[in-house]
Amino acid sequence: MNLASEIKDVFTYHKGRYGVRRIHRELVNRSHTVNHKRVQRIMHELGLCGKRPKEKYHSYQGVVGKVADNLINRDFTTTKPLQKWTTDVSQFSFPWGKCYLSPILDMHTNEVISYDLSQSPNMEQIRRMLEKGLGRFASLKGLIFHSDQGWQYQHAYYRNAIKEKGIIQSMSRKGNCYDNSIMETFFGRLKNEMFYGREKDYRSYEEFSAAMAEYIDYYNNERIQAKTKWMPPVKYRMASTC
């Protein structure tokens, strides 16, 4: 297979989600010696263009419970998995209605620890997400769990559930998206790669739910990232805990 064919193969396999940088790294991982500018030129000649970022669900409803201190304070640095997590809710709009995605992201590995997709942004959704995420690990004591000041995270159930595990709660300042930029970046990437321009492809909640499950599995186990030394999140976690 020549280089142009291999570039097209990588681009097609990842459904147009990879741009120049990731395709270049994938070729390097496949033992190719090639300059990223050459990859860029070939992609341009082939008319291959990686998807690029756009919106957001706002869950802030004022002070309805207890607001935690901003312990993260934009310090997203970590030395190993299970030191810092973040969460948020994002909205997806379709001709047939809306869906809401609530994931937990590990700040060290960028792995989606757990997630819940729902047609309603309610406390039951948060409960399901927490049960799946918190139930995966024997000990989470000392972990800092960050979020915005959404009503869900001020709720007594949420605060008590993480406190019981020894988790320390942290919240962004009101209306400051940069305080949770890791999650903002994740949502932008996800929507760009499997939602924007494809809204009409998902004809029902069930179809979108299946596509989301497929994407999260792909994201965790196959999608390489610069932050994780060009490994998928799960592989990077395993390498970090050896």
Language-model segment annotations:
Residues 13-16, 31-32, 76-78, 94-95, ...:
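Conserved, non-catalytic sequence blocks in retroelement Pol enzymes and Pol-derived host proteins
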Residues 1-80, 176, 232-241:
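Basic, flexible linker segments flanking DNA-binding modules
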Residues 163-167, 191-242:
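C-terminal domain-tail junction helix/linker
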Residues 7, 23, 39, 43, ...:
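Mobile genetic element proteins and their domesticated derivatives, centered on retroelements
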Residues 61-63, 147-149, 155-158, 171-191, ...:
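RNase H-like two-metal-ion nuclease catalytic core shared by retroviral integrases
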Residues 74, 78-113, 119-123:
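An active-site-proximal beta-strand-loop segment
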Residues 111-115, 169-172, 195-198:
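Short small-residue beta-strand/loop micro-motif enriched in glycine and branched aliphatics
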Residues 116-138:
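Active-site beta-loop-alpha junctions of metal-dependent nucleic acid enzymes
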